[in-house]
Amino acid sequence: MLTGVYLATKKDKTVYYRSNITHKGRHISLGSFPTEVQAHQAYTAACELLSGTETIDEAFYRTNQLAFEKIVSLINFRDNHMYIPTPIYLRKNYFSYYLSIHRELKFDIDDLFYYLSLIHI
């Protein structure tokens, strides 16, 4: 099995592949994939994002390997040392919530705790 890939079986006995990564002690699921190669590509992309310097806009070309929400979460974790499973990126005095690749909402940082209370981290 390739690095970062785990075999899984659905209730109907269909085989699929899970990909995950552990970074700074945090276990992060990267998703489910139909092939081992695709799951490994997601793992490789996550490794590159977490060790690189790409901005969110520069990293969106990786959506063929990872969901854009996961890209935002990983880059936020790399840059701000806080893993948020929703597509939130912390900035100085405000944060961005990405509805899609081309749709970014900006909120005052004081509102962050409200949004975090809605999710389980």
Locate each region found by the language model.
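Intrinsically disordered, low-complexity charged/polar segments
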Residues: 53-87
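Compositionally biased low-complexity segments at domain edges in trafficked proteins
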Residues: 73-108
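Short aromatic-glycine-(Arg/Gly/Cys) micro-motifs in beta-strand/loop hairpins
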Residues: 5-28
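Conserved small/polar residues in nucleotide/adenosyl-binding loops
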Residues: 119-121
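Short beta-strand segments enriched for Tyr within beta-sheet-rich domains
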Residues: 39-43
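Sec-exported extracytoplasmic/periplasmic mature domains
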Residues: 48-52
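A short, exposed loop/beta-hairpin motif centered on an aromatic-Gly-Thr core
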Residues: 26-37
